[in-house]
Structures are given as structure tokens and as C-alpha cells.
């Protein structure tokens, strides 16, 4: 974080007429990070209440503390009262963002946000100093933290925007003020909170609230909800598609090559290019198209963007291929929903190996759609060319039953991680491949921790 005047950073939070030019070089929510000249933001929590550390933060040199309410022992002149700590972070993040002028790409969507963010970063990073959202810092606390990482030498920023309720993307977009927006697709994640995919689409389109007049909005032309959505008139839609040559950017001759994909990219503005990406599945080709469209609409050269995409690296447990002895394991257990499950099974069906096995767990936060979604997953698994399916989790029991009913002969529903690992170890042989996918809360890496040591023997 670059140092900026307190009066600039606290504008909209401090009382009218507040004036203090002292430089602030850190905004923190962690009392252990407090240093002279910082601002400490107190968050109430289940285990700790940041308000309990406010007085100590001032003793250690904090210039100001942001509090939800007055705290005994904290001088009023050093306390900034904001009933909502998240709102305070967003206001300061927006104020800080306004002092600098990098080109910003904002990424949202139901599926593929993080991968598209990573691809966009890879596409842009070769053109100048670029930052991106780290980890899962895509909410009203994490996004301001990303803003605070912008410096005077930052030329580009790629910012992921997540949500679970309506209104959240609008607030994030107004903080980040992207120059280009991306909506990857409209799925069913958080449908329990929003009620319908139409409402999810409206929530994702809130990214337009942060886009200036004439800004490009990169949209999935293969998504029926985005296609029929009423787009704000102030944005300029840029459509990408797998196969539709009428789109602004499309992919033709899509094929899997080893652990990646190859395709012909057609750009109405720039012609045709042969592209390879080190990620499997047609859904990742769509993510690459979105990243390409955003980067080139910033004015970056297509050749350099494509070269960057070829160096893309997956993060975490997102379709990470692990060679376990003489078997391949595709770790895709960072998150899951019906759309990403379907895409993963389609990718895995084309994966070159002797036999295919899958360990699938619950998809969380589906509300009333959970039962039919898990049953449909079972039917999809039965058609995915699997030798055997192992499931784990209460909802995944529906998947196991549906797969059996659809004709998959070898199906095991495991009651714990050890049973899941044992079922796979008893069946798999050299040359086989395993797909592992579930929502993050199912922690399927614990089953893999029991599986891998035996494979290595």
C-alpha cells in the first residue's frame, strides 16, 4: 500500500470537515499487524472482537481505529464510527483506488471466476506490472485488500468478484471500478439465496454499476440467461462463444491435446490464431476466450495475450493433475456445482487413460434444488464412461442411487474418507485415472491423503 493522506482515505467515513494530511501506509483488520501510522478496522467475530484490541492498537501507534460503536479508552478524535466494518473497508478501498489509475478487469459469474481470473492475469502480466485477487479474497473484505495492493507502478489489476446475495456485486464493482467486466456464465450457485437463475443473472449484471460509459462487458454468448438479459445501455457487450462464428470472439476446432486444449480462435477485430492452453475441458476454452476478449479490449496485442494464456497455471485443487505412481488423479475439489460437475465429467470422458474412476461429493448451497441436482449428477456419471463411481456425503448418496438406476454397475457410497480411499485402492490399477470433485466443504483432499501413500508403495 502506498501512503496517502488520512483525509483522503477516510472520506465518507470521518465527520464532515475532517482534515488530516498525515500519511497512512496500512489498513489492517489484524491487531498483530498494527504499526505506527496505520488504520485498524475492528470487526466483531465469533471468537474475537476487534473492538477489544482498539485501545491497544492506538498505544502501538495506529493513527485511527474504525469502530462500530464508541469504545471505552479510545479517544473520540482517533475513532471513526461506522456501523458496518465491511462498508468501512469498501469505502476506504474505493478512496484508495481513486488515487491510482491502473487498467482493471473485473471478473464475476457462477462458474469459472477464479480460473478466468488466473487466465486473464496470465494474458496480461507480460505487458506490465499486474496484480490479481489472491486466494478467495473476492468479497467485501478481500476486494478492498486487493485495492490496497495497487501501487504507483501498478499498470493492470485483475479482480475477482464473488457474491451470495443480491447487491454485493454492485458494491464490489463500485469499489474496484473496472475498465472491463467479465461474466463467465449464469449457473445455480447460491440459488438458495436468490431464488432463480434469472435473479442470479441480475445479480451478476450488477458489475455494470462500476463500468464507465462505453466500457466493454465480456459475456458468454452460449449462456441463454445472458443472451436474453436486458443489458444496461452504457456498456458495450463483447460476446464469446464455443462455435458461434457470429460472436465477437469464438473458438473452432476445439480438441484435447495431452493435459491441455487446442483450438482456433476467431476474433472479429483481429483475425484467426491457433491457441493452446494448459487446462483440460471445453469449459476452460470458454474461460480462455473470456480472458482473451478482456485483455485485447484493453488494447493489448493478441499475439502477446495468446502467449500469456499458454503459460497459465491452475491454482489450488482446480483440475490439478497429480501423477500418483502410475495413475493420474485430477484434483478438482476446490468447489462444485451442477454446471462445473457436468463440465468436469465431460472433460474426464475424453481424458486419455486405461480406465476412468470418479470420487464425487456433495454440492453445497443448492437449497431446494439439491435433491434433483444430485440425482441428475448420478445420471450424468452413468454416461461419463466410468468404470466405477465412489460417492461421499449425505446428498451424494442420491448421486450413487441415481447412477445405479441409470445402469452404472459399480457404485460405492462411502461413509467416511477411509472407505472412499479403500474403495478406490481396491479397484484402480496402473494406467487408470481418477476424477475427484465436490464442494470445498466436503474436504475430499482428506480421502486423497489416505489414497496417495498407498499408491506410492
Where are the regions that the model predicts?
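N-terminal leader/targeting and accessory segments in enzymes
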Residues: 1-91, 351-353, 379-380, 384-394
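ATP-dependent carboxylate/acyl-activation modules
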Residues: 107, 316-318, 441-449, 457
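Acidic, Mg2+-coordinating active-site environments of NTP-dependent enzymes
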Residues: 8, 67, 71-75, 182-328, ...
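Short acidic-hydrophobic, aromatic-tinged amphipathic segments that line or gate anion-handling sites
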Residues: 80-84, 411-420
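Residue-level signal for inorganic ion chemistry
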Residues: 38, 57, 92, 107, ...
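Active-site beta-alpha connecting loops in nucleotide-dependent enzymes
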Residues: 45-48, 315, 333-407, 457
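Phosphate-binding loop of NTP-binding sites
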Residues: 8, 88-221, 225-233, 426, ...
Amino acid at each position: 500500500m502506498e501512503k496517502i493522506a488520512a483525509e483522503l482515505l477516510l472520506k465518507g467515513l470521518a465527520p464532515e470537515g475532517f482534515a488530516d494530511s498525515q500519511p497512512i501506509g496500512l489498513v489492517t483488520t489484524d491487531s498483530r499487524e498494527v504499526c505506527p501510522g496505520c488504520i485498524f478496522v475492528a470487526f466483531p467475530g465469533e471468537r474475537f472482537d476487534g473492538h477489544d484490541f482498539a485501545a491497544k492498537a492506538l498505544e502501538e501507534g495506529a493513527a485511527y481505529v474504525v469502530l462500530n460503536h464508541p469504545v471505552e479508552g479510545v479517544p473520540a478524535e482517533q475513532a471513526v464510527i461506522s456501523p458496518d466494518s465491511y462498508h468501512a473497508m469498501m469505502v476506504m478501498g474505493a478512496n484508495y483506488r481513486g488515487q491510482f489509475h491502473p487498467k482493471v478487469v473485473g471478473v464475476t459469474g457462477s462458474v469459472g471466476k477464479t480460473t478466468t481470473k488466473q487466465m486473464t492475469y496470465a494474458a496480461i502480466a507480460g505487458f506490465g506490472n499486474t496484480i490479481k485477487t489472491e486466494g478467495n479474497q473476492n468479497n467485501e473484505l478481500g476486494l478492498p485488500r486487493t485495492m490496497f495492493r495497487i501501487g504507483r507502478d501498478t499498470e493492470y489489476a485483475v479482480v475477482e468478484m464473488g457474491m451470495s446475495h443480491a447487491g454485493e456485486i454492485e458494491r464490489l464493482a463500485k469499489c474496484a471500478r473496472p475498465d472491463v467486466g467479465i461474466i463467465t456464465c449464469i449457473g445455480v450457485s447460491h440459488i438458495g439465496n436468490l431464488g432463480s437463475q434469472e435473479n442470479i443473472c441480475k445479480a451478476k449484471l450488477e458489475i455494470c454499476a462500476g463500468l464507465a460509459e462505453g466500457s466493454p462487458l465480456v459475456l458468454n454468448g452460449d449462456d441463454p440467461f445472458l443472451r436474453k438479459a436486458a443489458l444496461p445501455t452504457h456498456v458495450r457487450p463483447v460476446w464469446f462463444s464455443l462455435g458461434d462464428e457470429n460472436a465477437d470472439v469464438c473458438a473452432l476446432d476445439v480438441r484435447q491435446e495431452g493435459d491441455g486444449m487446442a483450438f482456433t480462435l476467431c476474433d472479429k477485430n483481429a483475425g484467426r490464431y491457433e491457441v493452446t492452453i494448459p487446462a483440460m475441458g471445453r469449459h476452460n476454452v470458454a474461460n480462455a476466450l473470456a480472458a482473451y476478449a478482456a485483455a485485447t479490449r484493453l488494447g493489448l496485442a493478441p499475439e502477446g495475450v495468446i502467449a500469456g494464456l499458454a503459460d497459465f497455471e491452475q491454482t489450488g485443487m482446480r483440475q490439478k493433475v497429480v501423477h500418483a505412481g502410475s495413475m493420474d488423479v485430477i484434483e478438482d475439489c476446490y468447489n462444485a456445482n451442477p454446471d462445473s460437475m457436468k463440465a468436469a465429467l465431460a472433460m474426464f470422458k475424453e481424458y486419455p487413460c486405461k480406465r476412468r474412476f470418479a470420487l464425487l461429493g456433495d454440492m453445497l448451497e443448492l437449497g431446494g434444488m439439491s435433491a434433483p441436482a444430485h440425482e441428475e449428477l448420478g445420471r450424468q456419471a452413468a454416461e461419463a464412461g466410468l468404470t466405477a463411481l465412489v460417492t461421499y456425503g449425505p446428498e451424494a448418496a442420491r448421486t450413487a442411487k441415481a447412477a445405479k438406476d441409470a445402469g452404472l454397475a459399480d457404485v460405492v457410497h462411502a461413509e467416511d474418507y477411509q472407505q472412499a480411499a479403500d474403495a478406490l485402492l481396491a479397484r484402480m490399477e496402473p494406467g487408470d485415472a481418477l476424477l475427484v470433485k465436490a464442494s470445498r466443504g466436503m474436504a475430499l483432499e482428506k480421502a486423497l491423503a489416505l489414497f496417495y501413500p498407498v499408491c506410492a508403495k
